[in-house]
Amino acid sequence: MFSFRTTSLLEQPDLVLKNGRLGLLCNHTAWHPEYGEYLFETLAKRGNLKRVFLPEHGLFGELQDQIKLDKLNVYDSLGLNGVEFVSLYGTDENSLTAQKELITDLDALIVELQDVGARYYTYNSTLYNLFRLLKKEDINISVYIVDHLNPAGRQVEGTMLEGEYTSFIGIEGLPHRHGLTIGEMSSLFYSEANAKFPLHIISANASLITKDLLPWSIPPSPNIPGLFTCFFYCGQCLWEGTNVSEGRGTTRPFEQFGAPYMESLINYNKRNGLMSWNDPENPLYDQGVYIRWQRFIPTFHKYKDQSCFGFQLLLNPGMQYHSLSHALRTMRFLKDNCPEFEFRPGKYEVGNDKKAIELLVGDSVLLMYLNGECDWDVTKEYIKIEEQKWIRKAKKYLLYDEQLCRVK
């Protein structure tokens, strides 16, 4: 059973929400200023909240990327007597999926998380694992998804993940930038699993808060500090698979990138008769952004306390920008022009032993391009075809009027 609700969660008349034993998968983005409190506080006051499941980054988005949440006693000071906290991002790989017995004693499960529109973002993976558990174990529990708008909008970028690159940072079949809300993604997971449990999506338009405030104002994780970050993240996240800093440890992660060895590029334009990095003849040129060369010093993560030569990307108002394509071209440029450039070695993420760049790119054709085995025109056309395939597939799961689109 599936339903799409147009009134807010707390206005729902369902008796299971008022009297049933509730579980809640959430973090700090489930905060509602009309009540001045988090959803877990509101439900705890009702007396029927039994369990809170936590995704990567913790209850308040306080943990950096890939930091395991094992010490749950840090939440004891909240004073939520009788409410159990469960980590879905612990050291044990099995923690990524909730244990069956932690679900079967509940009557309903509520989910409220703010996604950012990219397949690497693990909140969707946590939700996907939950749906797979419900389907596999035939658990007939009511699930309520409090939807939020996608801050990255309806633009689609990239190719659908190939099965061999599946991991916790990539669900097979999802493109790099999917254009869906978390409610619409839930509908897709539900349909593809042929699930039967009752699924109810609470419209993002049911509350002015979920529609207008939350997607833009509360950072969903430590390195997505603002709205603009979401427009860059789809492409700039690929730097995680290299020895280039993606800007973690600065106030502008994913909006800037660099490395100490990139200092060798400082005279590139002069040597090649180019006016600047924004010269249309420059290999890094993209009409969607202005490129500002700079230096920055990360306070943690890659190149901690070291001066990095690099670039800040500034959106060009009114122009379309394909972050993934720009990142791929930039990465190929660095590979060809900086001998020190390397892909990050070793295992990167649970569920797959492949290197980080393979899991993040997730496509054999795009990896061939990065390795110099095919040219950009072929790659660009391939990306276009893949984006068109995804739009045709995903449009039946749309819950709102605005349609999916791609950069022409």
Model-derived segments and their meaning:
Residues 9-22, 100-108:
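Glycine-rich phosphate/diphosphate-binding loops that line cofactor/substrate pockets in enzymes
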Residues 25-27, 53:
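Short hydrophobic segments within beta-strands
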Residues 51-200:
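Chitinase-like catalytic core of GlcNAc-active glycosidases
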Residues 259-380:
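Conserved functional hotspot residues or short segments at active or partner-binding sites
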